[in-house]
């Protein structure tokens, strides 16, 4: 399971270290806001007016209020996946290609 967290841990750690405000969307649609105080394999401690322990299995999406650098040690690896400008165009083109094939 350590391989699966090679992107998650550096991302959450950067959000925690830089105290970036985040919106966390749960699978039931509820939106939580605050700063990540700490996290482990199963939970994120989210601090706003109160601290909330949020179980990761209930989380759909974590949205930072600003871009965060979370580079890992692997050169040229998948560490830049967060940048919006690089990912927006190819995914829309790919979905259009699949529509044309039908």
From Swiss-Prot:
What job does this protein perform? RNA chaperone that binds small regulatory RNA (sRNAs) and mRNAs to facilitate mRNA translational regulation in response to envelope stress, environmental stress and changes in metabolite concentrations. Also binds with high specificity to tRNAs.
Subunit-level organization: Homohexamer.
Query: What family does this chain come from, according to its entry?
Result: Belongs to the Hfq family.
Its recorded name reads RNA-binding protein Hfq
SUPFAM superfamilies for the chain: Sm-like ribonucleoproteins
| Cellular component terms (Gene Ontology) | cytosol
Spans through the membrane:
none
Tell me the NCBIfam families matching this sequence.
Hfq (TIGR02383), PRK00395.1 (NF001602)
Q: Which UniProt keywords apply?
A: RNA-binding, Stress response
What GO terms describe the biological role, i.e. biological process, of this protein? regulation of DNA-templated transcription; regulation of RNA stability; regulation of translation, ncRNA-mediated
Q: Where is this region: Disordered?
A: 63-102
Which PANTHER family has this protein been placed in? RNA-BINDING PROTEIN HFQ
């Amino acid at each position: 399971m350590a391989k699966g967290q090679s992107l998650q841990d550096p991302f959450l750690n950067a959000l925690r270290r830089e105290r970036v405000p985040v919106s966390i969307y749960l699978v039931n649609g509820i939106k939580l806001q605050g700063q990540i105080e700490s996290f482990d394999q199963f939970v994120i401690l989210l601090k706003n007016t109160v601290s909330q322990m949020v179980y990761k299995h209930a989380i759909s999406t974590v949205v930072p209020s600003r871009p965060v650098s979370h580079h890992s040690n692997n050169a040229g690896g998948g560490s830049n996946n967060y940048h919006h400008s690089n990912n927006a165009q190819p995914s829309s083109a790919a979905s259009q290609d699949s529509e044309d094939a039908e």
